[in-house]
Amino acid sequence: MNEQQRKQQSQIRTEQANVDRIKNTSSEDMIAKYFQQEYEPQSPDIKQARKRKREDVQFHYDFSIPEDMEKIGHGKKFLIRTYGCQMNEHDTEVMAGILSEMGYESTTVTEEADIILLNTCAIRENAENKVFGEIGHLKPLKLENPDLIIGVCGCMSQEESVVDRILQKHQHIDLIFGTHNIHRLPHLVKEALFGKEMIVEVWSKEGDIIENLPKARKGKIKAWVNIMYGCDKFCTYCIVPMTRGKERSRRPKDIIQEVRHLVAQGYQEVTLLGQNVNAYGKDFEDIEYGLGDLMNDIHKIDIPRVRFTTSHPRDFDDRLIEVLAQGGNLLDHIHLPVQSGSSEILKKMNRKYTREEYLELVRKIRIAMPNATLTTDIIVGFPNETEEQFEETMTLVEEVGFEAAYTFIYSPREGTPAARKKDDVPEEVKKQRLYRLNELVNKQSAASMKDYAGKKVKVLVEGESKKDPEVLAGYTEKNKLVNFKGPKSSIGKIVEVEITETKTWSLNGVMVENTVEVN
């Protein structure tokens, strides 16, 4: 028997021991053992979540890697696979920063990794299926290398049913943690390295705000800046309030300091992040300060581009519109999820606005910023959506003139009110509606792109095109993808490009000589 076979047999014996242990332990006992005391062993409960109290959020500025963990990753590598939204991408940057400070190096090669983390998304069933598929694919790698640490984190980890499934069926997973305790990663890795059982630490109570977490950002061109956490809107289809917790805002001074630091490092663009970004500041009790005020302060900082996402129409107030209308580094590309064009469906979704109120908000934005680009999110096939209600969505898309949209078939999420609704819309009808909606969105996108033919646009160059390394790619102020040929030295800079060809979702052009705007 060679060394590899011995390792595999040892791993199999360990897994069998875990299986036997789990068989002799009830799911409730397992969950009670691994989850914090605040966690009640049950599926996400929106009624209980609504009753949560607004406790004082503590701010911490003293994060550091424990001395005994500072070099534990020396000579080892990590890989983080990220699923879902920009918030998850930002969380991945934080985890990568922590692991880097522990001595680990990043890799994109699965077989090279000593730690693999799956940063998961729970917003749709399809995203969860991808994660469980990946968990299965990693099992042979774990058998081959028993010292490999495999962890599952992110929003799926906040679901009791997901953790229970992993405990029962995927004993090759070493580590599970949630969205509220990322700062405890060094301690969790240590436990996984030296412990003999699967390490599970999921907090149901929202975490405090940890301000000085390290971040390993990709490049020095664009940066995510998280300004708040959580969501209190409780849309009936959405699990985010359960997986991300109540709304908690960072202090303005900490955000502004982070943006200034990014400017000093040479970043050209920041995107302010939040599950419901324009609810920023509503939880402050000592100051009256919202997203409009924050944007106004960042407007004064010498950074070329500032964006924000994702906003909720209900919180998009006149102050924010007034500030955005100043222009300058505040870009007039606004992502404003509508979800449906039917007031009846919007009410069932608990969006707290009507079709007419949404259109009035769009009118206000257009008056203040006539050239603003609007994009959106839309769900089709919400339980019992009629053909007439779907047509209302189609006419709203045309009336607003969205230049892009993220479109989805409704995906029921366990524990949400909408998931309990009886649905009489056939799956084939939902697919047809999605197809028709996408056809309309594609048509409107193509029409908006044609307006750029022959014009010159400012492009923040992000790197080589994914399709051709001889071509550079970047984005305009209105978030349009532009491909063009130019010197590699222009990467990370804002250049002027003349558009020579328009496509449905991208533009081609030629770089105008001597137009580098930012060094």
UniProtKB/Swiss-Prot annotation:
Residue span, MTTase N-terminal domain: 76-194
Organism, scientific name: Oceanobacillus iheyensis (strain DSM 14371 / CIP 107618 / JCM 11309 / KCTC 3954 / HTE831)
InterPro entries: Elp3/MiaA/NifB-like_rSAM (IPR006638), Methylthiotransferase (IPR005839), Methylthiotransferase_CS (IPR020612), Methylthiotransferase_N (IPR013848), Methylthiotransferase_N_sf (IPR038135), MiaB_methiolase (IPR006463), rSAM (IPR007197), rSAM_horseshoe (IPR023404)
E.C. numbers: 2.8.4.3
Names of required cofactors: [4Fe-4S] cluster
Name of this chain's protein: tRNA-2-methylthio-N(6)-dimethylallyladenosine synthase
Localization: Cytoplasm
Binding site for [4Fe-4S] cluster 2: 231, 235, 238
Subunit-structure text: Monomer.
Family: Belongs to the methylthiotransferase family. MiaB subfamily.
Gene: miaB
Phylogenetic lineage: Bacteria, Bacillati, Bacillota, Bacilli, Bacillales
Main EC class the enzyme belongs to: transferase
Molecular functions (GO terms): 4 iron, 4 sulfur cluster binding; metal ion binding; N6-isopentenyladenosine methylthiotransferase activity
